[in-house]
């Protein structure tokens, strides 16, 4: 009889092979154990390390615990409480699900598992080591929760133990694992010790609000990161991106401040990292790494988490959509951040409190493909806002000394006029004798008009504001390609209630919901004339102050075109005269040219 060349591996050997994928180093053990504690509902986790984890890794939690009858199963390969069917795997939200971590860890160490559930009057302890798959169960003393001790890691695989680094290096890897997990779980306290000394202690925060989350971010990434970062809140359908993106000034050679998460799971995903790097491409030097903390939440059916042994990567079913969504969200946050950067000359901007609001901007989303990547200038502290109000400039321009007959004429740039027999400025035949005739641009800040025998200067900025006010009155609405999400604090929410009716009447379509104690707005559509504006900045300015006239507020705070060619200025005047000739008259500043025309 021919002997079989293919045979089934013994369970002990199979576990050790699996351990080669799951247990790379002590930090891998810590990651698996912490994730199990989180899945068990723990809100306090203590991790004790000795000699970099090679001698001892002890984790204690106050989770739901493991019942006596399940202790042996917990150490058996492919035994789990997380899933039961293939459909469960496709909808998985827990951090663990394969049921092989404890079996793999126990196959290369001496493992003790002590646990108690709330329904048990006493705790029970399970012990196993190495290739011996026998599990010893005995009574123990323990509060509700679980303690796992992993001693003498790789004691039975000398080749693996030989590749461990120094205690300091291995502990640094453990420290980084705890940091990454703690960032995603601010409502859970973590204590990390090494050789009996407390190294890290992250206290839990009260809730998941942005203000509370910032406490955990500051504890892990430092206050300097928070000072240089902008909170991002970006949502479209089932996709939700939130977190913090730093200013380009915080870019660094190493990626030690780059954190990304998918459905609460620590990730080092290529698609996410590429999208973020592309968003920063024009803002930071080549080779530098941006600093960011980003959380991506989406329907679990839209990704496959079972593609990496350590679950560091996922496979998105619509990778291009995810990439474009993240790219645009980060780009808009950066654009809003640069727009809000104060300058020494900026004196007329509205002060805003540094609070828990979003930093996304839908100017691109309003009318462009979300996969398009529109380049924008490298970071600069300068803005396009004038240092003086337009009215001051125009007043200085036309002001002449009453005691002097103005020996110097105003500087005027105009299209050449037809030469006449007399030196006086004459007008061409105007079919609308009571309409204004545009003669020239005045220093790119105003239009010189002639109406009958009178001359006027009209500020371009005021004209643009009037045009926006008239457009708002038309109440034409345009849907946004990707809705804009805003998170409001209590004061901002009260202002939103105050302005809600006026905003909806002017063409906004806004949905409101309450989430984790915060008011969240989803901007679905906006007035057509505001579609190119920084909506995030505009609305938050509105919710941070009081105004009686929304149209006037938007006109004064929108970024409007103030540089026109002469034909463009002519069309602007013609449009406004047809709609609001009386309001236009209020903007005209009379200019007396009689001294030059006689």
From Swiss-Prot:
Pfam families: DNA_mis_repair, HATPase_c_3, MutL_C. Keywords: DNA damage, DNA repair. GO terms for molecular function: ATP binding; ATP hydrolysis activity; ATP-dependent DNA damage sensor activity; mismatched DNA binding. Coiled coil: none annotated. GO terms for cellular component: mismatch repair complex. GO terms for biological process: mismatch repair. SMART domains: DNA_mis_repair, MutL_C. CDD domains: HATPase_MutL-MLH-PMS-like (cd16926), MutL_Trans_MutL (cd03482). This protein is involved in the repair of mismatches in DNA. It is required for dam-dependent methyl-directed DNA mismatch repair. May act as a 'molecular matchmaker', a protein that promotes the formation of a stable complex between two or more DNA-binding proteins in an ATP-dependent manner without itself being part of a final effector complex. NCBIfam families: mutl, PRK00095.1-1. Belongs to the DNA mismatch repair MutL/HexB family. This is DNA mismatch repair protein MutL. It comes from Haemophilus ducreyi (strain 35000HP / ATCC 700724).
